[in-house]
């Protein structure tokens, strides 16, 4: 969950959503991260902007990496080794971005096997041999842990891969490691610090190290932006893919609920949870979406995708995707930042030049009406869904939300040094999912966000998509007061379970800002066409410089 002061109850705002071991496989050595045994110390940010040398793999796309493996310039092993070395160099040392909570100790062995398979049979597809990082709430049945950043799950390993991990392995990807996150996907406290977890410490924004990476997929966003992987996977309940994508200058896709299975993912709420691709380009995000989508008997929501999921999302990528597109401008998601509004005005003029038809304003009539019901549903589903998930982890030290609350109280110094667990406590007090209060709130969520919300707006103006700023530029990380972000447009698509794609739009004082395109259920093809057209017209992404802070003299807007 991502915090948004504009969209959730003021009394309980839900949050957004070293390593050196030498491994030698087939003569290839690399520093690999073993699982952390306990809490990571929160190191001070570097006092001055560190010098970060260029990296051979900086900004390389999946196509670039595959071309390198085809030509013999790279192998899966060499790519894995290079990314692991880079993680050691700038994630652990140097600017200490701290985005990777654990590197897969078997990554090089997996890469070696994939290289041998490529030689014998050819590549399985575009992800063959590509190192991918996944969020530390996604189960892997290997030597890595899955903890949601909590010390309560340290030492317990899942018995079975999540469907996401299974699909990545089937596609031939190298699961490089796990990324840090806002602990428990940022649903523990209304005063939380995005990007902080008891196990992983604080992830920093690579564009300005004193700024927040947003969350809860903080590490996936920061690591992708910092070129520590080919691709990453995040998860979202409300904002946790799109906000860290925006704050870290990358593309992120929050798909329609049911397009990607949630089985084996530590949950918040089954009515909103989903995994999603995070990448430096829209094309790479679409490639990853291809690999992750699919029906899973362990997640009944995926059966709804039958006949609705595309076989190949990359075929919808059109450099002229803005031409003729009718896009509604959701003005009620503006007004939280003058500089963001000015940047949006600039990019909207470019969209018009590219042939887009902007319907302005085009606001949801139900804007703000499902905030309270959303939070209520999350409280109910958190307790039920987390308890059900923990039943699959019999060797864990905790077996229920109540156990987690008690664990945190016993370990306050390490688990609650900056914020407490008021949302957990509220959730624990809730009744089963048969409660009328829950069922009424869930019905309100769906009605207000779907039929009377996004669907009604798109019907009224005959829209292909709705656009809004994804959020504000990255805020200063504040361990004392917690997050203080402003604005955010994720909630309607999140509550509806509809798709939402964010693309880099430009910079404010050197900090990236994204624009979101969202729409009806199963409209990923239309949204990808528009997002790709926007990306190709603006080319707004620029890699981070790992500065210690923003260059205030450059405050302004621009592509």
Indicate where each model-derived feature is located.
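Flexible glycine/proline-enriched surface loops and loop-helix/loop-strand junctions
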Residues: 147-150, 204-208, 216, 266-274, ...
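N-terminal twin-arginine translocation
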Residues: 12-21, 30-48
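Structural helix-boundary/capping segments
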Residues: 170, 174, 225-331, 345-354, ...
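Acyltransferase
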Residues: 80-81, 112, 162, 312, ...
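N-terminal secretory signal peptides
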Residues: 1-15
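Gly/Ser-rich catalytic/binding loops embedded in alpha/beta enzyme cores
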Residues: 29-32, 46-238, 256, 280, ...
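Short, surface-exposed loop/helix-turn segments at secondary-structure junctions
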Residues: 304-305, 439, 461, 470-491
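Short helix-loop capping/hinge segments that flank enzyme active sites or metal/cofactor-binding pockets
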Residues: 128-148, 314-330, 380-450, 504-512
């Amino acid at each position: 969950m991502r915090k948004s002061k504009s969209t959730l109850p003021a009394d309980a705002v839900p949050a957004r959503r070293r390593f050196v071991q030498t491994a030698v496989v087939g003569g290839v050595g690399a520093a690999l991260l073993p699982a952390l045994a306990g809490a990571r110390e929160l190191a001070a940010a570097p006092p001055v902007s560190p010098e970060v040398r260029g990296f051979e793999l900086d900004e390389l796309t999946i196509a670039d990496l595959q071309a390198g493996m085809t030509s013999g310039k790279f192998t899966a092993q060499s790519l894995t080794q290079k990314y692991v070395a880079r993680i050691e160099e700038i994630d652990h040392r140097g600017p200490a971005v701290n985005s990777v909570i654990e590197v897969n100790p078997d990554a090089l062995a997996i890469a070696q096997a994939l290289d041998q398979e490529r030689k014998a049979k050819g590549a399985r597809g575009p992800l063959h041999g590509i190192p991918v990082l996944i969020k530390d709430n996604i189960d892997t049945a290997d030597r890595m842990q899955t903890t949601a950043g909590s010390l309560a799950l340290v030492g317990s390993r899942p018995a079975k891969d999540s469907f996401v991990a299974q699909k990545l392995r089937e596609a031939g990807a190298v699961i490089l490691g796990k990324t840090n996150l806002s602990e428990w996907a940022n649903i523990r406290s209304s005063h939380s610090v995005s990007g902080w977890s008891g196990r992983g410490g604080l992830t920093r924004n690579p564009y300005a190290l004193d700024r927040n990476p947003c969350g809860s997929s903080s590490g996936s966003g920061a690591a992708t932006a910092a070129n520590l992987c080919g691709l990453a996977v995040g998860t979202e309940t409300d904002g946790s893919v799109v906000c860290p994508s925006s704050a870290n200058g990358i593309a992120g896709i929050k798909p329609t609920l049911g397009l990607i299975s949630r089985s084996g993912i530590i949950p918040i709420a089954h009515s909103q949870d989903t995994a999603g691709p995070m990448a430096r380009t829209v094309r790479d995000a679409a490639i990853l979406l291809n690999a992750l989508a699919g029906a899973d008997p362990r997640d009944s929501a995926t059966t709804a995708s039958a006949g609705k999921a595309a076989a190949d999302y990359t075929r919808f990528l059109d450099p002229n995707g803005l031409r003729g597109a009718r896009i509604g401008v959701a003005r009620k998601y503006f007004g939280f930042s003058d500089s963001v509004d000015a940047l949006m005005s600039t990019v909207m003029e470019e969209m018009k030049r590219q042939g887009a038809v902007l319907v302005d304003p085009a606001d949801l009539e139900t804007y703000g009406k499902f905030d309270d019901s959303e939070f209520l549903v999350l409280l109910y589903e958190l307790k039920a869904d987390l308890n059900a998930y923990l039943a699959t982890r019999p060797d864990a030290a905790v077996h229920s939300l109540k156990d987690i609350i008690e664990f945190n109280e016993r370990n306050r110094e390490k688990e609650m040094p900056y914020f407490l667990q008021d949302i957990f406590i509220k959730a624990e007090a809730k009744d089963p999912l048969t409660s009328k209060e829950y069922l009424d709130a869930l019905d309100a969520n769906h009605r207000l966000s779907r039929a009377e919300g996004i669907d009604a707006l798109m019907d009224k103006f005959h829209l292909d998509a709705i656009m809004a700023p994804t959020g504000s530029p990255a805020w200063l990380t504040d361990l004392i007061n917690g997050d203080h972000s402003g604005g955010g447009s994720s909630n309607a698509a999140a509550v509806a379970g509809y798709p939402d794609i964010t693309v880099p739009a430009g910079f404010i004082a050197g900090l990236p800002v994204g624009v979101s395109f969202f729409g009806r259920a199963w409209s990923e093809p239309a949204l990808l066409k528009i997002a790709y057209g926007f990306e190709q017209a603006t080319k707004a992404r620029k890699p981070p410089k790992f500065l210690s802070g923003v260059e205030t003299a450059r405050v302004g807007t621009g592509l």
